[in-house]
């Protein structure tokens, strides 16, 4: 069967309603066009439609405050020795609502992966970090709690470019990072473009997301850990070879529960549906599920990797074998690799999945043609 026909069969039911949670209403002090964004805000602030702002250093939204970003806003991080990032603390909100043709763009003065620090949102939803609380990798802000319906606001039609600033060997900034974010938050139609770390990362929480695109993120396109249990619908990851973008890209999905305690509760168990993952034919790993993570995958295509799907750790493989985790209609360009030989490629096929399919994509256009949710100009490629 041709690749496009595979896409069409998977995405025929890919029409979905808008977020029913979150808050889009703005209100507050309007920041003039051309202003510099820096420091901490403690009251409601509005970045007005079509305006351009400079981000210089940290920009922190404190508990009780709301940062409203209207359609068409451009935030440009200053390129110097000071790391630039946006941090939304517990109890604060960000309402960033663009449109498909008037996208909110967060970028850098220098069009280079790793130029700035991205956006970090901390919520009160549960996580399996030690003691149920954690500190954000960027900004050292607390996250976690027991409010799984917590609402940190809205992100719609937002693109983050050239993030991934390296603080040290252990800490690099993703494009979008969600720390203990609850399912009262709305995230849809967002893109991570040419970052030097992950595109989207989830540290616990219950946030649901849809219509996400990660292009040429040099670490993982999608990454989760610490007990993320949300739903993700319509995900795309696309990687080009190093001789095109100037660097290699790692996993398309990297899935963990907790690296220090594979059985930590709550266990990571997201539900992913309608997913297209295209690798760069350079690095090996495509979908890597490990360290006790559970998952439900349905209607997925993964290709362009030597090891398109790898399952690691006894806990992860037993969850698949016992149908706690599920894979259905997952189409892979090569066999599933089982580290512990518990959930084998034969079991994978028995569960209604397919391997060794010829799946080749010459450009992002091949993906866009079969994703009717990628319309307008909000996706850059």
Range-by-range predicted roles:
Residues 102-103:
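Glycine-rich loop(s) and the adjacent beta-strand/alpha-helix scaffold that form part
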Residues 23-67, 78-93, 98, 107-197, ...:
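Extracellular beta-rich repeat passengers
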Residues 7-10:
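Sec-dependent N-terminal signal peptides
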Residues 15-18:
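C-terminal motif of bacterial Sec signal peptides marking the signal peptidase cleavage site
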Residues 1-5:
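Positively charged n-region of N-terminal signal peptides that target proteins for export
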Residues 74-75:
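Short active-site-proximal "capping" loops at secondary-structure junctions
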């Amino acid at each position: 069967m041709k690749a496009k026909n595979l896409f069409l069969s998977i995405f025929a039911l890919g029409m979905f309603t808008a977020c029913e949670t979150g808050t889009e209403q703005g209100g507050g002090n309007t920041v003039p066009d051309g202003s510099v964004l820096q420091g901490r805000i403690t009251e409601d602030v509005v970045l007005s439609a079509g305006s351009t702002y400079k981000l210089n250093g940290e920009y922190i939204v404190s508990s009780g405050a709301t940062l409203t970003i209207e359609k068409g806003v451009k935030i440009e991080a200053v390129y110097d020795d000071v790391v630039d990032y946006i941090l939304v603390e517990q109890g604060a909100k960000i309402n960033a609502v663009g449109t498909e043709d008037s996208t909110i763009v967060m970028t850098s003065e220098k069009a280079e992966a790793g130029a700035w620090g991205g956006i970090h949102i901390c919520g009160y939803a549960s996580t399996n970090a030690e003691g149920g609380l954690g500190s954000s990798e960027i900004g050292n802000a607390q996250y976690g709690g027991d409010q799984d319906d917590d609402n940190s606001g809205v992100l719609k039609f937002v693109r983050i470019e050239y993030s991934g600033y390296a603080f040290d060997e252990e800490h690099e900034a993703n494009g979008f990072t969600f720390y203990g974010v609850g399912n009262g938050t709305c995230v849809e139609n967002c893109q991570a473009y040419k970052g030097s770390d992950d595109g989207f990362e989830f540290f616990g929480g219950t946030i649901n997301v849809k219509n996400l695109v990660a292009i040429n993120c040099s670490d993982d396109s999608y990454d989760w850990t610490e007990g993320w249990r949300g739903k993700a619908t319509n995900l795309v990851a696309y990687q080009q070879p190093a001789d095109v973008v100037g660097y290699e890209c790692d996993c398309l999905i990297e899935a963990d529960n907790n690296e220090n305690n594979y059985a930590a509760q709550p266990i990571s168990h997201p539900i992913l549906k309608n997913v297209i993952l295209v690798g760069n034919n350079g690095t090996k790993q495509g979908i890597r599920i490990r360290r006790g993570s559970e998952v439900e995958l349905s209607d997925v295509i993964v290709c362009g990797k030597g090891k398109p799907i790898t399952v690691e750790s006894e806990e992860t493989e037993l969850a698949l074998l016992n149908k706690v985790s599920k894979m259905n209609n997952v189409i892979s360009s090569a066999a599933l690799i089982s580290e512990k030989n518990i959930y084998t490629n034969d079991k994978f096929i028995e569960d209604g999945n397919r391997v060794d399919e010829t799946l080749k994509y010459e450009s992002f256009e091949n993906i866009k043609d079969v994703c009717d949710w990628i319309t307008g100009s909000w996706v850059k490629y």
